[in-house]
């Protein structure tokens, strides 16, 4: 079935591309001769033909079997992140204080808590983007890959979607660029040839996510990565992160995404950072909560 489906899709793609070429040639003809009296009938008949034309449809890419593989990355030291008494204040406002934690190589951890309690602020401290109190040490050979909603604004606006990914893809994943784009909802030829400058906010976010997944890093920090992803794409991303052999920090309110992915939870609240050595469901059980959104109400 999968072979037949693949063959049918390839056939459709060929027909689609031929039809698009024919449409473009017809439009060029109409444009060139629309004011020419001797060509009036030909122009009119081609306009009508375009109006009646049934467009070739291409089956959606079946991405269910797509496994994203991170590129091999250099091994980091045993303790990628060590914090001792780390805190952050803005004037009189204390965001959090005295955070002491150790993240080991290969750990997959979640930062959870209501908005404004310092999750993204601590990420910025790790990224060395802002000053802080206390000591924060990054381990030997740590190479950070960072995703936040604003990463999308750093993309080169003059490149197409395909070029953006083609520039960073190395090794065998190069043969899967089309599948990869399809998995993140850029499957059609038009979508992959769009310039970054015309993409919506959600599309830019998804593109920035693919780009990050292709870079060889050993500490991945994702700040609300699932905001613009559908269920299928979330699953593909989650599977890739499960296969990732580096260290992972995820800031998220998405219980289902974190379930089975993280084995340590850092809870931000009351100006403190508290460590829970468990998965997300066990954490919610201890809190007598159904979802992470309930933390907002506390």
Summary of predicted features, one role per range:
Residues 42-64, 108:
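ABC transporter TMD-NBD coupling linker
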Residues 37, 57, 186-188:
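Residue-level detector of short coil/turn "hinge" positions at structural boundaries
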Residues 10-34, 39-48, 285-298:
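ABC ATPase nucleotide-binding domains
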Residues 1-14, 65-298:
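ABC ATP-binding cassette signature C-motif
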């Amino acid at each position: 079935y999968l072979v037949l489906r693949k063959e049918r899709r390839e056939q459709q793609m060929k027909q689609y591309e031929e039809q698009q070429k024919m449409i473009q040639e017809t439009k060029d003809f109409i444009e060139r001769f629309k004011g020419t009296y001797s060509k009036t009938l030909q122009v009119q008949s081609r306009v009508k033909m375009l109006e009646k034309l049934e467009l070739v449809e291409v089956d959606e890419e079946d991405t269910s079997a797509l496994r994203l593989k991170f590129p091999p990355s250099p091994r980091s030291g045993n303790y990628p992140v060590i914090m001792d008494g780390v805190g952050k204040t803005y004037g009189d406002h204390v965001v959090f204080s005295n955070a002491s934690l150790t993240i080991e190589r290969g750990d997959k951890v979640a930062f959870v808590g209501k908005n404004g309690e310092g999750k993204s602020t601590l990420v910025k401290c790790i990224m060395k983007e802002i000053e802080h109190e206390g000591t924060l040490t990054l381990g030997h050979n740590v190479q950070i890959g960072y995703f936040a909603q604003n990463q999308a604004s750093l993309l080169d606006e003059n490149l197409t979607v395909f070029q953006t990914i083609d520039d960073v893809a190395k090794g065998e994943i190069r043969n899967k660029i089309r599948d990869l784009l399809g998995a993140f909802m850029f499957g059609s030829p038009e979508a992959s040839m769009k310039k970054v400058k015309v993409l919506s906010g959600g599309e830019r976010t998804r593109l920035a996510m693919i780009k990050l997944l292709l870079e060889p890093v050993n500490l991945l920090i994702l700040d609300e990565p699932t905001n613009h992803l559908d269920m299928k794409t979330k699953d593909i991303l989650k599977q890739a992160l499960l296969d990732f052999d580096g260290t992972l920090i995820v800031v998220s309110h998405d219980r289902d995404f974190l379930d089975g992915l993280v084995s340590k939870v850092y809870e931000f609240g009351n100006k403190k950072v508290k460590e829970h050595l468990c998965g997300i469901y066990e954490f919610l059980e201890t809190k007598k909560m159904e979802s992470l959104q309930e933390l907002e109400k506390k």
